[in-house]
């Protein structure tokens, strides 16, 4: 207690209430029966300070009552520390992330096509699995020091099953909400589960596209298509309405080539909108620019390329290793889709395969990195020692990174975080982690004239400015942690690691796919970055056309920088719930217009209960989430 009081005095703690957390001896401890007697004895012996056993809520309620008006208001991101473990099981993290987006789509499409059908129990079960995979209790205390024990394996089996079940449940729900197929297998319906109009590539399986290579819209206009080397059929679905569908027809005619073709020659991939160059020796992207612009948006000053594989053993970043010589092979020659396969040897892997894809007319390039990971070294003395010993804390540590150095003069980096956008350093609170940062869907680097939006679909951690996630084991010395992030346009996707000494996985092995996208652009637009990223993670869904006409779009949200992040049937089955997000960061007056009927709408919250009646527009603050409930008439 003397040391604690000294610490309060050192920092000039100005309040007369403090909160001390006691969780027993170690985390996840059982209640401590000695605590009550200790507090009783202390209060009887000493006049000051007095102790009260309380819950967190009680303690902070007492603090707020006495000092609420004196507490300073702080704004910013308290970037966390524990999330490094998501990279210790990259495949399962990917499964859970994808399942969350798939489930969001299933709920929206269910509200569009069968709003009176209740799926609440199954939806809640799927979300429960997603949340329990994301929850911090990853595995056994000896997961690194004794990784092959039944104790460790059984706990990991339980944890992994949450991701497996989330994946299977979300797939089943998405399949179940889709309209039943009609009798015309040559007609395809393309469904949009988001609140903005979409123009995107759709890929049909060989079986689904057996009717032919030529594609027409419902009005008879031909659209660009291409039979891929895999047997699949790719075509561009134009003007798929928000929360609606568009119908396309296949026939035996010749595929229509786009007006401006996508090409690949001499290492250069271009489509009249975007141009990228792949280095033949390394397979890295060494140039990227918008058509008509001279600025190369890839920073080559340190010899790195974009999407470069980097492998770090232990903590010395000067010893980082690159992939071996690349073999570059064209898989799709265009004219609609160009795809290049880049195969390399890679330290820490059995193989590394990277793919770069560009679609005619699209303003971005897609990257797919397939890592066939080798298993890290196991503890040579399993069962001896524990998470605090040398092996668990410092030995056989490794990580996989992909580099993204951008050349945007005086560019500001912005990171998508839950319901906000964060600038490293500038928007971080004191005490925030600066060695690694979680990312939702995208990072943008831009100045007033141009920039790049980077999207990650599977890997949720980045290192900013350099490889800075090299804190092995339990680093308790605060002076070892990074204190500042200087302005930079360079970052690294921290895809895999085994750095922590307990709970998280000791190793990963076999195949994991990491997907990214790069979109060069003009000035920064936060809402456009979110639309782009959500569009990739919640793609258009194609089905064999249903009987009858295409359903009318359900509703329209205005303005375009207010996004509906959620559309679902209410849990009670009596209405529809919409969650509107102020994606521009600026206050907007939003309007929801229903295409058929005009249901009564109320402000609501997570309870989905009716609040204040909504007439006309609703105010949506920047980065705010506003929930509306609409009851069917």
Briefly describe each language-model feature range.
Residues 4, 171-633:
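C-terminal (or distal) subdomains of carbohydrate-active enzymes
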Residues 1-178, 193, 451-543:
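Catalytic grooves of carbohydrate-active enzymes
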């Amino acid at each position: 207690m003397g040391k604690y009081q000294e610490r309060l005095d050192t920092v000039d703690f100005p309040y007369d209430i403090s909160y001390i957390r006691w969780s027993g001896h170690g985390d996840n401890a059982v209640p401590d029966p000695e605590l009550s007697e200790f507090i009783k004895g202390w209060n009887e012996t000493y006049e000051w300070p007095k102790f009260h056993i309380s819950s967190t809520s009680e303690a902070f309620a007492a603090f707020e009552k006495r000092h609420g008006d004196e507490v300073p208001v702080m704004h910013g991101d308290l970037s966390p520390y524990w999330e490094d473990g998501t990279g210790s099981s990259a495949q399962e993290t990917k499964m859970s992330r994808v399942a969350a987006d798939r489930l969001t789509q299933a709920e929206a499409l269910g509200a569009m096509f069968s709003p009176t059908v209740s799926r609440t129990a199954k939806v809640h079960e799927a979300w429960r699995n997603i949340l329990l995979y994301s929850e911090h209790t990853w595995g056994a205390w000896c997961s690194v020091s004794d990784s092959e024990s039944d104790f460790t394996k059984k706990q990991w089996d339980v944890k992994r099953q949450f991701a497996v079940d989330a994946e299977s449940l979300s797939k089943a729900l998405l399949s179940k909400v889709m309209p039943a197929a009609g009798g015309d297998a040559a007609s395809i319906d393309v469904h949009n589960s988001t609140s903005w109009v979409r123009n995107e590539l759709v890929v049909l399986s060989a079986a689904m596209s057996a009717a032919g290579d030529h594609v027409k819209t419902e009005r008879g206009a031909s659209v660009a298509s291409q039979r891929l080397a895999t047997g699949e059929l790719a075509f561009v679905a134009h003007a798929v309405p928000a929360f609606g569908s568009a119908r396309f027809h296949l026939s035996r005619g010749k595929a229509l080539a786009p007006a401006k073709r996508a090409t690949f020659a001499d290492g250069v991939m271009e489509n009249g909108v975007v141009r990228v160059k792949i280095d033949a020796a390394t397979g890295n992207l060494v140039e990227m620019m918008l058509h008509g612009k001279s600025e190369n948006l890839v920073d080559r000053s340190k010899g790195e390329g974009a999407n470069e594989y980097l492998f770090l053993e232990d903590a010395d970043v000067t010893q980082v290793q690159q992939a071996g010589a690349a073999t570059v092979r064209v898989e799709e020659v265009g004219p609609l889709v160009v795809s290049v396969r880049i195969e390399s040897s890679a330290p820490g892997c059995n193989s590394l395969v990277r793919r770069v894809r560009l679609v005619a007319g699209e303003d971005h390039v897609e990257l797919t990195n397939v890592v066939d990971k080798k298993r890290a070294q196991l503890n040579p003395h399993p069962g001896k020692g524990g998470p605090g010993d040398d092996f668990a804390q410092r030995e056989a540590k490794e990580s996989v990174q992909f580099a993204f150095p951008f050349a945007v003069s005086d560019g500001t980096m912005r990171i998508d975080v839950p319901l906000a956008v964060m600038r490293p350093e500038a928007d971080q609170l004191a005490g925030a982690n600066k060695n690694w940062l979680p990312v939702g869907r995208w990072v943008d680097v831009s100045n007033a004239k141009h920039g790049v939006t980077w999207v990650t679909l599977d890997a949720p951690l980045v290192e900013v400015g350099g490889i800075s996630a090299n804190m092995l084991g339990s680093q308790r010395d605060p002076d070892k942690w990074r204190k500042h992030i200087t302005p930079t346009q360079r970052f690294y996707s921290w895809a895999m690691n085994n750095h922590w000494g307990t709970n998280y996985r000791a190793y990963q092995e076999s195949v994991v796919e990491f997907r990214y996208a790069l979109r060069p652009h003009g000035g920064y637009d936060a809402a456009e970055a979110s639309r782009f990223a959500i569009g990739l993670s919640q793609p258009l869904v194609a089905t064999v056309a249903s009987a009858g006409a295409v359903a009318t779009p359900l509703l329209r949200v205005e303005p375009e920088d207010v996004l509906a992040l959620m559309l679902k049937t209410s849990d009670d089955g009596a209405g529809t719930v919409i969650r509107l997000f102020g994606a521009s960061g600026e206050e907007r007056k939003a309007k929801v217009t229903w295409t058929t009927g005009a249901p009564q709408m109320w402000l609501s919250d997570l309870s989905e209960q009716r609040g204040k009646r909504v007439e006309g527009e609703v105010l949506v603050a920047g980065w705010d989430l506003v929930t509306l409930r609409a009851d069917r008439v």
